[in-house]
Structure formats: structure tokens, C-alpha cells
Amino acid sequence: MNDTVHKHITVLLHEAVDGLAIKPNGIYIDGTFGRGGHSRLILSKLSEQGRLIATDRDPRAIAEANTINDARFQIVHTAFSAIPEVCEQLGLTGKIDGILLDLGVSSPQLDDAERGFSFMRDGPLDMRMDTTKGLSAAEWLAQVSVDDLAWVLKTFGEERFAKRIAQAVVSYNKSATDKISRTLQLAQIIADAVPFKDKHKHPATRSFQAIRIFINSELDELEKALQSALSVLAPEGRLSIISFHSLEDRMVKQFMKKNSKGMGVPKGLPILESELNKNIPLKIIGKAIMPSEAEIEANPRSRSAVLRIAEKR
């Protein structure tokens, strides 16, 4: 077992914050405070009139945020899908100059065995971002059917052996006196069920990702946040989003593409293209940004990160 504990290093720190094109007097939202890397950098670029609101589901992130003693900063314990409600309560709807979302699980969450995110460390099988709400992974697995579990593994983990793994997990929980309650216990059941081993990837990688995404409704949260971003942002407000797996990145990419696409003007039509496309809500800023080789070497967990930036017209 690998017991390496990774120091939390904020991925694409400067690139994501630069993507916000910070105005010193602006109002910004860090939707995923985590351990505060992005928030602290944003604050360093704001004047005394600037403002930063951060949200996070994780109680430990909230505790970390409460150590920041800065009148320009405010933390709200909620999911980033609730940003529209937060803005409404603060009278800031349509006034936000930039929203940053870092969709990754933080190193402290992964490395803390008690959180149940890691298949490399033994701990209670929890996986909840907000440990005060909802079912833990163990509680959900104790009641799920083979078909439902297989669907989750296939849909959110793109796991080719989804059915086989689901059968093994549900069968174990039905036959054993004590149901699956530990991370390494689940990881071993998955490993035993998988007929083909990838030497570069632990056999439980995709399943743990899928269960975590489902337990935390991560893609639903992202969908809600994307759909509401346009109403929250001010004109020329920026959206800077870091994703860590293809499902998230696909959603972000499609959202930005769909909302930035105009119509070509048919030949001979007496209308300017700018007039025809004036209601396009977004403009994509640059190409997708990946971590540099140097960043990947310093922080291997950054390897799969993709940053996309867009601006409200």
C-alpha cells in the first residue's frame, strides 16, 4: 500500500486566476474554496473595494476559510450549485465579475483515510463532500440493486466491467454478516471481480470515481452551476473552470460551445453578422489549458486537469 501523503498544491493556480482577468474593484466568486489557494491569490489582486465570496460543501474547507481575516472575503457553507441563491441574498445577481470552479477532489480529502475517498488507504467508506448530509457510500451500497450499481459504474466511471463488479459488490453485501464498510474492503472486492488488470491503473479507480460522483451528485451540481452562470455574471464577467475527468470536461466544453455559437449569414441576406449574433451569451477565451510538464512533475495529480475560460458578452 502506498502511504504517501501529498501536500495540497492548487492546480493551474495562476492560469485559472489569470483567466478571470481580475478587476481590482470587482466582485468574484470562488465556488470551490477547498484549501483556499485560488481565493488567496484572487484576494491579493483585489483593491480594498474588491470583494470575494467563496462557497464549499466540505466542513473542513469552511474551517480553513474561517482563518482568513479579511473584510473583503466571505465564505458560505453550500454547494456551488447554490451560487444563484447566494447572489440573490446578497443583492449581487448580474453583478459578478468572475466565477472560478475547481472541480477536483483536494489532496487533503484524498489523503484523509477517514473521508473514504481513497482506495489506497483504509478508512470508513463515506465519500461525502459534505459529511453532514445524505447517504454515505457504504449506506448506499448496502441497499443498491445490481442494475442500478452497474449503471452508476458505467455512466460515471466508464467502467467496462461494471456489471461484473456490481454483481460482486451486491452479492457480498447479501451474503456477508457485516456489509462492506471500509475502503480497502471495497477495493479488494472490485479487484477480485475484474478479470483484466491494467498495470498503470488500480482496478478500483473508475468505480471509486463513479460512486463518489453519484454520492455527491457532482454532474448535477455542475449542470446547475453552468445553467445559472449566465444570470449571475455581469457583462464581460469571466467563467474559469478546471475539470479533472472527461465527463466534467465534456459538459463544460459543450456548454461553452453551445452558448458561444452564432449563425453564419447566408449570402445575399441584408444583415450584418454582428447583428445576427448579438444575442450570443458567451465568448470562449483561448484554447483549453493543460498543466505544464513542470507542474505535472511537481504535482502528478494535476495530470488530468483541463482549464476552460469563457466571457459573458
From Swiss-Prot:
Pfam families: Methyltransf_5. One of its GO terms (molecular function) is rRNA (cytosine-N4-)-methyltransferase activity. It comes from the Bacteria. S-adenosyl-L-methionine binds at G36, G37, H38, D56, F80, D102, Q109. One of its GO terms (biological process) is rRNA base methylation. Its main location: cytoplasm. It is found in: Cytoplasm. One of its GO terms (cellular component) is cytoplasm. Keywords: Cytoplasm, Methyltransferase, rRNA processing, S-adenosyl-L-methionine, Transferase. InterPro entries: RsmH (IPR002903), SAM-dep_MeTrfase_MraW_recog (IPR023397), SAM-dependent_MTases_sf (IPR029063). Its EC number is 2.1.1.199. It catalyses: cytidine(1402) in 16S rRNA + S-adenosyl-L-methionine = N(4)-methylcytidine(1402) in 16S rRNA + S-adenosyl-L-homocysteine + H(+). NCBIfam families: 16S rRNA (cytosine(1402)-N(4))-methyltransferase RsmH. Specifically methylates the N4 position of cytidine in position 1402 (C1402) of 16S rRNA. Belongs to the methyltransferase superfamily. RsmH family. This is Ribosomal RNA small subunit methyltransferase H. The lineage of its organism: Bacteria, Pseudomonadati, Pseudomonadota, Gammaproteobacteria, Pasteurellales. The gene is rsmH.
